[in-house]
Regions:
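Conserved beta-loop-beta element that borders a ligand/cofactor-binding pocket
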Residues: 82-105
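Conserved catalytic-site region of short-chain dehydrogenase/reductase
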Residues: 19, 55-63, 102-106, 111
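NAD(P)H-binding glycine-rich loop region in Rossmannoid oxidoreductase-like domains
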Residues: 1-33, 41, 61-63
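Short-chain dehydrogenase/reductase
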Residues: 26-32, 69-81, 111-115, 134-138
Length: 255
């Protein structure tokens, strides 16, 4: 409560982004419980606005009407979005932002999937790409950050805004990287082989408590297209959709 004293708005962007954890409950504690705690603070502190950062994985895949729950990260992000929507429906000052695949300068970790894949490929540690022809929506982190600021300061007509980017096949990232660096394209891994690898990696992780390289849940996600429409955000938040090629060049300048 002390931290919220004199605060006008809260951005709740914290999340556990991970393929796997030894205890699935940690996803619930952070991804759902963290949001519930932020909402509790807002209710008791007179916060004017709460901006909650969701994920494109909390939305249904392209062409579907139901969200997936392929792994514990996705399951808890779907549930957290429902919690935020319920709060907004009760009249609480909640705005939900739904970024696409975030990329840009930063450490190559699980929250920066594009940076991690490129870094692994550059160092020869990437076995290949699963679902290379599936289209995802790539949102540059700087543009998403600007949208968060706009969501705090602007009067808004809606309670949820999608922050997608250029919709492109996964392999397009590596084609741009090849053109910049001369690095060959990665191999394409069939879904069946990736699922088998995921099962083996899950078994290894259970025995060693070390994170798997891939999981069957991740393969389920990679089977789908995740294209996004950000027109409302462009109009009401002045959201910028950066061309993927110019965005990937910002990665090149930091590697």
């Amino acid at each position: 409560m002390t931290a919220a004293r004199g605060v006008d708005a809260i951005i709740h962007a914290a999340a556990l982004v991970s393929l796997w954890q030894p205890s699935p409950a940690i996803f619930d504690e952070i991804n759902i419980g963290g949001l519930e705690s932020a909402l509790d603070v807002a209710r008791t502190s007179g916060i004017r606005r709460v901006v909650y950062t969701s994920s494109f994985l909390a939305l249904p895949p392209a062409g579907a009407t139901t969200a997936l729950r392929a792994n514990d990260y996705q399951r808890t992000k779907v549930r957290a979005r429902e919690v935020a929507q319920a709060a907004a429906a009760r009249g609480e000052p909640v705005v939900i932002l739904v970024p696409g695949v975030l990329y840009g300068p930063g450490p190559p970790n699980e929250a920066n999937l594009v940076g991690r894949l490129i870094d692994d490929h550059r160092r020869g540690h990437l076995p290949g790409i699963v679902g290379s022809d599936r289209c995802w929506s790539y949102a540059h982190v700087d543009d998403v950050a600007d949208a968060h600021v706009a969501a705090i300061v602007r009067p808004l007509a809606a309670t949820e805004y999608v922050l997608g980017g250029e919709n492109a096949p996964q392999m397009r990232i590596f084609e741009i990287w090849r053109d910049l660096t001369g690095t060959p394209l990665p191999r394409r891994i069939p879904f069946a082989a990736a699922s088998a690898m995921g099962w083996l990696e899950e078994c290894r992780a259970t025995m060693t408590r070390r994170p798997p390289i891939i999981t069957r849940g991740a393969v389920k996600i990679f089977r789908h297209d995740w294209t996004l429409n950000s027109s409302r955000s462009v109009e009401e938040l002045s959201y910028r959709i950066r061309p993927l090629e110019s965005g990937v060049k910002t990665l090149f300048s930091t590697r």
